[in-house]
């Protein structure tokens, strides 16, 4: 049990490594910001469509058949999008980055910091939700077969490094504090060992493929919405459009290679 929990903790703390990479730079240039956010978009879109959502389809079709399970996965996916969209609309206009400003530069700087803060917190929340069932899955793999669990944990750790960057970059820009940015990045990853512990104590006797599949589908929807509504527009608005797109492609490539390494 300690071995399984240790593997899960290792994978979760990798977000802190990503945060450390993001805050190690002395200044955050527009190019670095655009590239990092674009990279994060690539990571989140690829992992959502290639790993999380197909996993939801597999879980749900195994219970409700091809048609019923597919419908459930699609509903869960768009349900996740609707949930985060509603939360976004409930944010007061004064701090909502989607509301245009009619005031000058000082307010624009204030709105930029608010946008970055909101983006970082929402990204941390989405990653934490994603890491919760992921941690439980890593823990179960560690309990069942250590030879399978080790490459799974390493692959998840590789995934978590760019996710830590996704959290730390906007929060460093918003707060000006490397310590806070690194703390949030690390905290989002600690959802992984928390998922392992809570899952072992409470969920394991009750959770079934239906709940797990719907959870995966909704998390994929949340991550896609954040990517296209928050991360990508901010990356492009930096004025470094091509840098953002190159970062996006690089993020997808890193995720693809990390998945292929452990097939």
UniProtKB/Swiss-Prot annotation:
Residue numbers binding Zn(2+): 134, 159, 163
GO CC list: plasma membrane
Classification lineage: Bacteria, Bacillati, Actinomycetota, Actinomycetes, Mycobacteriales
Organism (species): Corynebacterium glutamicum (strain ATCC 13032 / DSM 20300 / JCM 1318 / BCRC 11384 / CCUG 27702 / LMG 3730 / NBRC 12168 / NCIMB 10025 / NRRL B-2784 / 534)
GO MF entries: metal ion binding; zinc ion transmembrane transporter activity
Residues annotated as transmembrane: 1-21, 37-57, 68-88, 116-136, 138-158, 184-204, 206-226, 243-263
Role: Mediates zinc uptake. May also transport other divalent cations.
Catalysis performed (reactions): Zn(2+)(in) = Zn(2+)(out)
Protein name: Zinc transporter ZupT
Membrane topology, record value: Multi-pass membrane protein
Family, per entry: Belongs to the ZIP transporter (TC 2.A.5) family. ZupT subfamily.
């Amino acid at each position: 049990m300690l071995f399984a929990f240790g593997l899960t903790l290792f994978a979760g703390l990798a977000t802190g490594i990503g945060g450390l990479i993001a805050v190690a730079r002395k200044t955050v240039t527009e190019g670095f910001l655009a590239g990092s956010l674009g990279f994060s978009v690539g990571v989140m879109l690829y992992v959502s469509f290639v790993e999380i959502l197909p996993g939801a389809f597999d879980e749900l079709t195994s219970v409700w058949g091809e048609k019923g399970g597919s419908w459930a996965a699609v509903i869960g996916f768009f349900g996740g999008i609707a949930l985060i969209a509603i939360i976004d609309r409930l944010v007061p206009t004064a701090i909502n980055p989607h509301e245009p400003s009619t005031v000058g530069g000082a307010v624009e700087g204030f709105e930029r910091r608010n946008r970055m803060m909101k983006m970082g917190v929402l990204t941390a929340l989405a990653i934490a939700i994603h890491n919760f069932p992921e941690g439980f899955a890593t823990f179960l793999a560690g309990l069942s077969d250590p030879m399978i669990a080790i490459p799974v944990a390493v692959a998840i750790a590789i995934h978590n490094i760019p996710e830590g960057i996704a959290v730390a970059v906007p929060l460093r820009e918003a707060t000006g504090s490397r310590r806070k940015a690194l703390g949030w990045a690390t905290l989002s990853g600690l959802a992984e060992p928390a998922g392992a512990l809570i899952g072992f104590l409470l969920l394991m006797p009750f959770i079934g493929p239906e709940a797990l599949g719907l959870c995966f589908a909704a998390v994929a929807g949340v991550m896609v919405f954040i990517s296209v509504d928050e991360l990508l527009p901010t990356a492009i608005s930096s004025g470094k459009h091509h840098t953002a797109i190159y970062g996006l492609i690089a993020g997808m490539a890193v995720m693809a290679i990390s998945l292929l390494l452990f097939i």
